[in-house]
Amino acid sequence: MPEYIVFVMPPEGEDAEPFDIPEWGYIEAIATAERYRAHGWKACIIDYGTPFVLWRAKCPDGDAISVLARTCDEACIRARAVSEDYDSFQRED
């Protein structure tokens, strides 16, 4: 079973969906994330088995959305795919 997941989000305009890449070691996960980042993708490393939770993403103008993600980094990537203005992230427990 993999120990890490690399979540990747394609750059705007790419005809691709975000997806997870399983990795068995941290060094491999870092290499995978860096390889995608070098091509303009956003990427973050997540411990395997981390559950999805709701995160609240807010803009300075007060607009907010809920994002289902495993980590704050993943929530940030997902919310900023909607708008770069989201700059405040808080877990909704």
Regions found by a protein language model. Give the residues of each.
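Short aromatic-glycine-(Arg/Gly/Cys) micro-motifs in beta-strand/loop hairpins
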Residues: 1-18, 46-64
